[in-house]
Swiss-Prot record:
This is Uncharacterized protein Rv0028. It holds the Pfam family DUF2694. The modification N-acetylthreonine is found at T2. It comes from the Bacteria. Keywords: Acetylation.
Length: 101
């Protein structure tokens, strides 16, 4: 359960942030390129959170699919594809900007 699943890997649109998650939505790791460090802390934190949200939701949707496949109905707290689509839209709209020095 602690191994990253490549199906949940999510890359920030800049290509400078990679978030990997494990089954169940547990975050495995965050990788930053050197260029990612050229932005201000607030923008970088937001970029990591948005990227992590998408990665986590991918993992949680796998759990949702397993619940449905077993013939059960997930609770309203289990994310849906709509939640993933909203998170993807937010991520795609985000930009890393260079820090003013």
């Amino acid at each position: 359960m602690t191994d990253a699943n490549p199906a949940f890997d999510t890359v920030h649109p800049s290509g400078h942030i990679l978030v990997r998650s494990c089954r169940g939505g547990y975050m495995h790791s965050v990788s930053l390129s050197e260029a990612a460090m050229e932005t201000d802390a607030e923008t970088l934190a937001e970029a990591i959170l948005l990227t992590a949200d998408v990665s986590c939701l991918k993992a949680l949707l796998e759990v949702r699919n397993e619940i449905v496949a077993a013939g059960h109905t997930p609770s309203a707290q289990v994310p849906t594809t709509d939640d993933l689509n909203v998170a993807i839209e937010k991520l795609l709209a985000h930009q890393l900007r260079r820090r003013n020095r």
